[in-house]
Amino acid sequence: MGDRRVAALRTGLGIQAVLTALAALILLAFPGIPSPPLYVSLAGFAMAGILIASNGISAYLKVFVSVYGVGYLLLAGSKTVAAMGLLPPVVAALLPPAFAATGAVVFAAIVLGISHLEPIRAITNIADPYFANRDKPTKEIGLFRWFGTTEGRIGRNLVALSIFVNFADVALTLRFNFFYRDIYNSLQEYDANAFWYQLLWVFVPLATLNIAIGMFDLFVDSSLLIRWRTWLTHSLYERWLGNGTHYRIPFTDEEADNPDQRIQ
């Protein structure tokens, strides 16, 4: 049992869990550091436990848990850095509220929980062959080849990047809600200085980020789709043509309804 725990800590998720627990401990142990609310720090320990418990789940779902763990660190850490005055006011104004970090922990817990459901396992059994494969990167596609040494690792990193981009988009949408509140408050109070500040120094950066994130998200998702379908096509052809499978099918008891035409 002890050996299993040590082995779990040596995995990528295990190392990430240790770093997350250390970050949460730092926020609690050093009162001189401007820290987020107590529940945000405690959520870090919960995140560490979720990361360790996720070692045995699907390779596809591990990506989600890992990204949410990184999201917690970024959100909690950025609010702490902003509280220390190390970020420009314009950047600090764009940050979501502190409780957004706990949202990442909740989503990670949901992913861990649903990973044990049979319908979800049926889906991940279809997705995992691509994300767990160790084949060399597809030569025909140059996009994101530097993301890993195997096609499976590239796929996992692209999924992680896509989730992170969507996570940023949700945080940006939340920040837009606070912008609407502040700018309408300035209109109600006839505060011209606050109005122009919100319009020029908050809305313009938010709108620019929103457009950039939307375009980048489309680029990442399209790249993942192309790479995944290319690998699936190669895998299907290899299984169909390898070891004379297509010759031996007529001599088995299994019925095949024009598989060659379906592949085409």
Regions from the language model: what does each represent?
Residues 181-188, 209, 213, 237, ...:
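Short, well-ordered alpha-helical packing segments
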Residues 229-248:
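Short cytosolic helices in intracellular loops of multi-pass membrane proteins
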Residues 1-203, 217-221, 225, 247-264:
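Membrane-integrated ABC transporters
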Residues 169, 205-217, 234:
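Alpha-helical transmembrane segments of multipass membrane proteins
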